[in-house]
Amino acid sequence: MKISQLLLLFCFFISLHTAFAQDESSYTFKKPSANGTGKVYLGREIAHVMSFEGVDWLERNSRTQEENTILAVTSLPIKSNSVVADIGAGSGFYTFRVAQRIPKGKVYAVEIQNDAIAYLKKKALEDKLANVEVIKGTEISPNLPPNSIDLAFMVDVYHELAHPVAYLASLSKALKPGGRLLLLEYKEEDPAVAIKAEHKMSVKQAKKELAANGFKLVENGTFLPLQHYLLFEKTVN
């Protein structure tokens, strides 16, 4: 290996170490709650990641009506040629519906769980959707190319990110200038939303966390029955 390549590799690992160290310094810790990790970011306990064993719940027949997922998908700010990323794609409930909306575009289905990745790849083949690419991410990065996506969306996922600071920094680099990030999160403010507390978020908390990482709220949609529709735009290109 050439010296120049070694230097580039060395610089990469140094920058990765620095980013991870900065990420870790952003958190405090407490005794974990029943559904939390004990890791706290800006006053919010980070929730445990939902195992892919819960795939049946993701694909339940009642979901379309309960969450009005048709309205959620049609409300995405995308065009027929948009490039988007479904972060924490799970079973691909949203991935494959969005892919049908952008026949000239592309959907990156990003997951960290191997079972989910296998499921997504199999379903993409079965549905013959060539514009879906499954990506194995990590807890600190979606592993997407720089300046590659117009929109990233997370459906009931952001609150589970183990390293939100590092992850958002990496995701910001993957977004094109003016790129947007959409969070769908169960409404913490509404006690009628029967979801465990650690798996809900308030608008105030989401705004605080995203603002701290270079994103501003540009739309607060209140049209979904159970979830916030929070569209952010990155403020630094």
Show where each model-derived region lies:
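Class I SAM-dependent transferase core
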Residues: 23-77, 83
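A short acidic, Gly/Pro-enriched loop at the edge of an enzyme's catalytic core
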Residues: 142-151
